[in-house]
């Protein structure tokens, strides 16, 4: 990432979401290059204080998405700004270069620039091969990804970015054994240093669930938490392990299952509090609070539900074209006993998942847990009806 920030002819930085990493990287770019940095934002109310005076391209979001009209206007404005930036690359847009005349910036040696460009070209080719693998199915898809994996050879620091792309491709293909094998092939120091690698590793261990896989997943996630406050993603992965244990033990050992349920709730709560804009842990928190069904849990559900509904609504709610956003709005409607909204969401989900029915089955798993718990806050007749509709695909 730093190489790209230092060497890219033009950098487009979107600050719609107040992400600390993005602002840090914007600062790196401004310290290194005098010009050709373009800021974009879909935030209402202007830019944050420290960059409020900088020139930015504003665009309008409607229900968390760009309308065709807004997208066309944004594309035109961005094309003009990129052209201007390239034509007038000597004009400083960095506040640091504007403040200190003659500030030298950072100039990398020419041979290093050539090496970086070669690596960037190789990364582009790897991503094209992985994208081509996505259209394949079953063993053919996994083998296409494995071919890229084998071509990587021994994983060094310079190979981390393409290795993460391969890991993500394995995850999307459901090739858990291959994902785990690639992580375990990495040098231990490199593996420990990457949060993303460890998150993908824990995800795969939990889903594979062979032998002590889940205990190992917990250890991996605990090591991440020990290094830094848990992110929404890390907390959500931890919660998922306990949620799966809850689902597997609720019939045979209800007392043990109750303990797993409370730990899952705690981790989903921590994930949502870490970043209330991330709807995934919030939706699961609401569903598990409804499954708990106790007075305290239902009181927390009533407090939490509006915030999670808002987070999902920012991304379009049931009007979204993303299945998981609509499915989240669906689950929240059920948790809030809003059956008319749940019915509308379900209709849209079925159209979005028409070529991938496994998505509907995944959503049904949460509702099956809800039905088994039979919480007093959820209407059982309506719940049974939506489960039948999900099963129909």
Question: For each predicted feature, which ranges?
Answer:
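An anion/phosphate-binding loop that grips the pyrophosphate of nucleotide cofactors and donors
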Residues: 8
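C-terminal interaction surface of TIR/SEFIR-family domains
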Residues: 55-129
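Amphipathic alpha-helical repeat scaffolds of TPR domains
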Residues: 117-139, 143-146, 153-169, 189-208, ...
